[in-house]
Amino acid sequence: MPQLDLSWLGLRLETSLPWLLLLLIGASWLLVRVLTQTYIFYRTYQHLCDFPQPPKWNWFLGHLGMITPTEQGLKQVTKLVATYPQGFMTWLGPILPIITLCHPDVIRSVLSASASVALKEVIFYSFLKPWLGDGLLLSDGDKWSCHRRMLTPAFHFNILKPYVKIFNDSTNIMHAKWQDLASGGSARLDMFKNISLMTLDSLQKCVFSFDSNCQEKPSEYISAILELSALVAKRYQQLLLHTDSLYQLTHNGRRFHKACKLVHNFTDAVIQGRRRALPSQHEDDILKAKARSKTLDFIDVLLLTKDEDGKELSDEDIRAEADTFMFEGHDTTASGLSWILYNLARHPEYQERCRQEVRELLRDRESTEIEWDDLAQLPFLTMCIKESLRLHPPVTVISRRCTQDIVLPDGRVIPKGVICIINIFATHHNPTVWPDPEVYDPFRFDPENIKDRSPLAFIPFSAGPRNCIGQTFAMNEMKVALALTLLRFRVLPDDKEPRRKPELILRAEGGLWLRVEPLSTQ
């Protein structure tokens, strides 16, 4: 019988058997892996084929660059949603598929999935990680769930109620500046610049109980936050600088690191100062003292909160949540309020109706301050805010990467691991959901017109388990600022129409410019 001759390998048969067995096992394992990955790829590809695709540039580029962060890109989105009202699939290059959903019936499956199934896809937010850490915006899984439960009391109406006074004060400071600038009859103002400072002023008081007077004089901390936001938006558009090691070598990378350090040092100093005061005061004493001053700030709540096991948040966790609130709370509200004023400037009949509603509310008062109970007494103003958030949502897209297959109501499957975009802008401009979607019509939000509409047709604050925890805070601030603005100023459109610019939030190229006229001069 012929024998296997391995002498040319320098091996004898009896000594080579273990090696042959090991080689066979390794080859079998590799074959199984290859076959498994091939099956997964084939199965994923089959599911992806169920989603319609716009025409590609070519096989290599796919749809890369088809939707740009510009006015033209948003117009392209409105064309796509008119053609594919349920959603569509695109390829970034030859191998990265992205599913975009833009109809309430299909986005429900993703937004209603648990936070452990529909993970936030951080590819669009990863540049914020060195600044915001593992705050609610960027964290996932058990940590996110735990922190969400612990932070929910911070947004209870008992905590939010005293903040209305802060919103009034910060808006008054902004308006005093406007009155000076418009002393000649009117002033042309960049709403983003002015309102961003106002929202940061409010947030610094609500989060830290700190008044930097940033609307009237430069503040290092506030300037650092504005710089960080601008640098992140700029980096997002520079593909070569998406690599951290390369970005750190650039001038902007060094600026980002310096601004990050300044912001962290400020937050850490506040936390450590409050932490040192805690051992000398009982928790009940702190709460009673704060109750007398009628304000419990965000840092207070974070320091006092405990999970189900009585465990407190670490200083690092508190810093991450405070920095996240400062970032998310100023940009989104500034965007929303700026576009609201723009829409009311273009529709003076709605602006005047809002103004009359505010005047009627404050008719018999000596003070023109908006109070907590007033916020529910401004129905038409609220309708105008919501219609502007529909037409110009501050956050235009959110992203998820699911840890398991998600089955849509029509039977199609979003495969595990595929990036899924919930396009808020497209959903809000979907003609099958909103007739004449490009028209600004506040009466869409009349109670009679809301009854038969899906709650997921309007999602400026997202929806489901990962919806915006601060949406009531944001709506309250916008109501106060808008009511006082319309009470004191007439807002007029600029000669030049703004060009929308979707970054982390919806901006306008070169700023959003409007003219304001003090009503006392009319």
From Swiss-Prot:
Q: Name one Pfam family in it.
A: p450
Q: Name the GO cellular-component terms.
A: endoplasmic reticulum membrane
Any one Gene Ontology molecular-function term assigned to this protein's record: iron ion binding
Q: Which residues bind heme?
A: 328, 468
Q: Name one GO biological process term.
A: prostaglandin catabolic process
Where can this protein be found?
A: Endoplasmic reticulum membrane; Microsome membrane
Q: What cofactor is this protein dependent on?
A: heme
Topology class, membrane: Multi-pass membrane protein
Which reaction does this enzyme catalyse, per its entry? (5Z,8Z,11Z,14Z)-eicosatetraenoate + reduced [NADPH--hemoprotein reductase] + O2 = 20-hydroxy-(5Z,8Z,11Z,14Z)-eicosatetraenoate + oxidized [NADPH--hemoprotein reductase] + H2O + H(+); leukotriene B4 + reduced [NADPH--hemoprotein reductase] + O2 = 20-hydroxy-leukotriene B4 + oxidized [NADPH--hemoprotein reductase] + H2O + H(+); 6-trans-leukotriene B4 + reduced [NADPH--hemoprotein reductase] + O2 = 20-hydroxy-6-trans-leukotriene B4 + oxidized [NADPH--hemoprotein reductase] + H2O + H(+); prostaglandin A1 + reduced [NADPH--hemoprotein reductase] + O2 = 20-hydroxy prostaglandin A1 + oxidized [NADPH--hemoprotein reductase] + H2O + H(+)
EC number(s) reported in the record: 1.14.14.94
Q: Where is it expressed, tissue-wise?
A: Expressed in hepatocytes. High expression in liver and kidney. Lower expression in brain.
Q: Which residues cross the membrane?
A: 15-35, 87-107
What switches on expression, per the entry, is described as:
Up-regulated in hepatocytes by pro-inflammatory cytokine IL6 and down-regulated by anti-inflammatory cytokine IL10.
Q: Print the keywords alphabetically.
A: Endoplasmic reticulum, Heme, Iron, Membrane, Metal-binding, Microsome, Monooxygenase, Oxidoreductase, Transmembrane, Transmembrane helix
Leading EC class: oxidoreductase
Q: Spell out the family assignment given in the record's similarity comment.
A: Belongs to the cytochrome P450 family.
Q: What does this protein do, in the record's words?
A: A cytochrome P450 monooxygenase involved in the metabolism of arachidonic acid and its oxygenated derivatives. Mechanistically, uses molecular oxygen inserting one oxygen atom into a substrate, and reducing the second into a water molecule, with two electrons provided by NADPH via cytochrome P450 reductase (CPR; NADPH-ferrihemoprotein reductase). Participates in the conversion of arachidonic acid to omega-hydroxyeicosatetraenoic acid (20-HETE), a signaling molecule acting both as vasoconstrictive and natriuretic with overall effect on arterial blood pressure.
**Name of the protein described by the UniProt record:** Cytochrome P450 4F4
- The scientific name of the source species is Rattus norvegicus
The coding gene here is Cyp4f4
